[in-house]
């Protein structure tokens, strides 16, 4: 028997407002524990929540960017549960009347475009954070009350690979809107995954399992891959899948049972009596719609149609707004479009991954990268020299040409000097001359490599090729 995988994702996104969802406390990451709190966050008796207008605006902006319908009437509800980092013993959320519904995003997997539906986007407040030690627990309520949006996909995802692509696209869109930085390492984007299997051709869904502790997109993919195999083996052996919540163990790559999954009835949702229902008129919707910036799909189309970039380049460059803005800044400073794309996808990305930093953490600017690329383009700097100059540029900034001169890496363009390298290479490799004359194209490349090696990468490659061809034809 063959099974079809059905996946739905619930993504929590922290809105980067200055204050919290229902209180004036700061909503900033990294503060001293319990320093960003007040009487509302601590649930003192008699205090009343006040809705953060900007958080509502940003929830609407995100909904619109995800092609959702904005509800004219929505409301807040109490989600009741007991936990030490939830001082009210309930969380203010939206149960049956969310701010956004019926959206979608398009993803690309293996060259195919697929539309993934989005059921809803609702607003809620975050809980605090518990840290468990040996024999005791610590509670930090700085995060309590931070504005969140929860984005719930339709069960349209059919593989872990599609789930990864969905998350990548969703993060990209939200980052472009400016409502969140979507940093998983800081908790501003968190994902829970629901997965079930059913025999191919069956319409009814199987029993779903919820996965938690998915701290990166890669862990989401790995957790789903493991759970897919686990459920398939269980079903093929005649077993049943229980409705469970399981935790992904990063060290083993397996999922571990946490608890039997609760249903919505367990939370005893009811209307939040201290907050009036939201009424969003058409004027309010129109004002928010005007704030939506250029989104990744629009930029991608512009890069392909107007700048002539390949689809792949355009896709990679628009994955993050930071990279896309940097690319546009560099070409605005006169850098060649394709060379800039190659450097950002190649040398720049390699440097960022190796050092585990983002562009903003380096001394790179669109201007100084463009300066280096223009030197490559006009032949002043070879690609080999650029690879030696680039790390210095990224770490300390400055001017690429000055770095090249300070390091003694100035490209050799003097013909007499280059001719000496060329004749030495030919004298030392007579077999390559014979190979060239016999039509073996690789011989030319080998000789160029020998010349570049002898000149420590400083020979002007264009002039080397020209002189080498002349000398070969004369022998």
From Swiss-Prot:
A Pfam family found in this protein is GatB_Yqey
A single GO molecular function term of this UniProt record: glutaminyl-tRNA synthase (glutamine-hydrolyzing) activity
Q: What is this protein called?
A: Aspartyl/glutamyl-tRNA(Asn/Gln) amidotransferase subunit B
What EC number(s) would the UniProt record show? 6.3.5.-
Recorded catalytic reaction(s): these are: L-glutamyl-tRNA(Gln) + L-glutamine + ATP + H2O = L-glutaminyl-tRNA(Gln) + L-glutamate + ADP + phosphate + H(+); L-aspartyl-tRNA(Asn) + L-glutamine + ATP + H2O = L-asparaginyl-tRNA(Asn) + L-glutamate + ADP + phosphate + 2 H(+)
Alphabetical list of InterPro entries matching this protein? Asn/Gln-tRNA_amidoTrfase_suB/E, Asn/Gln-tRNA_Trfase_suB/E_cat, Asn/Gln_amidotransferase, Asn/Gln_tRNA_amidoTrase-B-like, GatB, GatB_C_1, GatB_Yqey_C_2, Gln-tRNA_amidoTrfase_suB_CS
Self-association state and partner proteins as the record states: Heterotrimer of A, B and C subunits.
Which Gene Ontology BP terms does the record give? glutaminyl-tRNAGln biosynthesis via transamidation; translation
Q: Which domain of life is it from?
A: Bacteria
**Can you tell me which family this protein belongs to?**
Belongs to the GatB/GatE family. GatB subfamily.
Species whose genome carries this gene: Staphylococcus sp
Q: Does the keyword Ligase apply?
A: yes
| Cited Gene3D superfamilies | 1.10.10.410, GatB domain, N-terminal subdomain
Q: What does this protein do?
A: Allows the formation of correctly charged Asn-tRNA(Asn) or Gln-tRNA(Gln) through the transamidation of misacylated Asp-tRNA(Asn) or Glu-tRNA(Gln) in organisms which lack either or both of asparaginyl-tRNA or glutaminyl-tRNA synthetases. The reaction takes place in the presence of glutamine and ATP through an activated phospho-Asp-tRNA(Asn) or phospho-Glu-tRNA(Gln).
Q: Does the keyword Nucleotide-binding apply?
A: yes
For this UniProt record, the keywords arranged alphabetically read as follows: ATP-binding, Ligase, Nucleotide-binding, Protein biosynthesis
